[in-house]
Amino acid sequence: ASIMATDYTDGLALKAMKNIFTYLPAAYENGPHDAKAREQMATASTMAGMAFANAFLGVCHSIAHKLGAFHHLPHGIANAILITDVMRFNAAEVPAKMGTFSQYAYPHCKERYLECANFLGIQGKNDDEKFENFLTAIEELKAKVGIKKTIKDYGVDEKYFLDTLDDMVEQAFDDQCTGANPRYPLMREIKEMYLKAYYGK
């Protein structure tokens, strides 16, 4: 959903996503005993890397970078914890109008997420339901591979997390990935996402 995405990067990202949904559970469960699943995950990783090397990333990675730097949370786990909440943030119908990307009246991110859902064959009676079903599918995939629900579940100390929160927020706001996010976040919105990811819903 990066504002730098193109048809070229979209094709790579969509195929990588489909491989992940198809093969990650088997690669996780069967390890070295399922060479096909591991091969396809390696392919997905490479294709995703080619996509984001050209289209950049977004605020999910910005927030995750600081969780790694301050709290040593592995980057993939940090992104997995955050992803659906960031998607909800990005898909807001009428977010605050930002002057940074004046070519957009408002972000069109929900349409991009629905394109992803369509590519995976996820259905819904309307766009809102399809989007929610897509988020549910992501949460189910996370559960299959042992991703815990919150930052707190990974043993990050609450006091130290809160003590470092403002620094993480400022650094995430300034992170190079934030500028490519389809909805430009306010610092208080980044803070809300951190707190939600720490404590859960």
Please annotate each region the language model reported.
Residues 8, 36, 129, 152-155, ...:
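Short coil/turn segments at secondary-structure boundaries
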Residues 2, 6, 10, 53, ...:
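Hydrophobic alpha-helical scaffolding
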